[in-house]
From Swiss-Prot:
InterPro entries: UPF0756_TM. It comes from Paenibacillus sp. (strain JDR-2). The chain crosses the membrane at residues 6-26, 50-70, 75-95, 111-131, 132-152. HAMAP family: UPF0756. It comes from the Bacteria. Keywords: Cell membrane, Membrane, Transmembrane, Transmembrane helix. This is UPF0756 membrane protein Pjdr2_2290. Belongs to the UPF0756 family. It is a multi-pass membrane protein.
Amino acid sequence: MMTGELILVGLIVIGLIGRSPIIATAACVLLAVKLLHLSRFLPSIERRGLELGLLFLTLSVLVPFASGKVQMKELIAAFNTWPGWLALIGGAVAAYMNAKGLDLLKLDPQMVVGLVIGSIFGIIFLRGIPVGPLMAAGITAILYKLFKLMSGG
C-alpha cells in the first residue's frame, strides 16, 4: 500500500475512534477513488469539493424556509428579542470565521491534518462534538492572527 492509502486508512480509523463519521466517510470515498484507479478525478474533487460541500450545507440550512417550518413570526422574533439578536450576531461571526477558514485552507491545504487531529483530540478528551474543518480552520485563522499580533510579526 502506498503512503496516501495508508494515511487514508489511518484517517478512517481515527474518524471511527473519534466518532467523526464525516471524516471516516470522506477518507473511505477517497480511498475508493484511489483503489479503483480513478485518481484523475482527485484534482476536480480538490478544486470543487469545498464549493459542493458548502452548497449542500446551505441547502440543508435553508430547507426550513422552503418547507414552511419557519414562519414570518419567527423571522420577526429574531429582531425583537435579545436571544434573537445574539443568534444573528453569532451567525454573522460564524460566517466570518468560516470565510477566514476557507481562505486559510486554500492557502495551506496541509493544515487539514492538524485540524483533523485537533478535532479528534477535542472529541475524545474534551467530550466535544465533530465540527467541519471549515469552522476549525476559521478558529485557527483567528488564533494565527492573534499570535502574529502578540508576537509582533
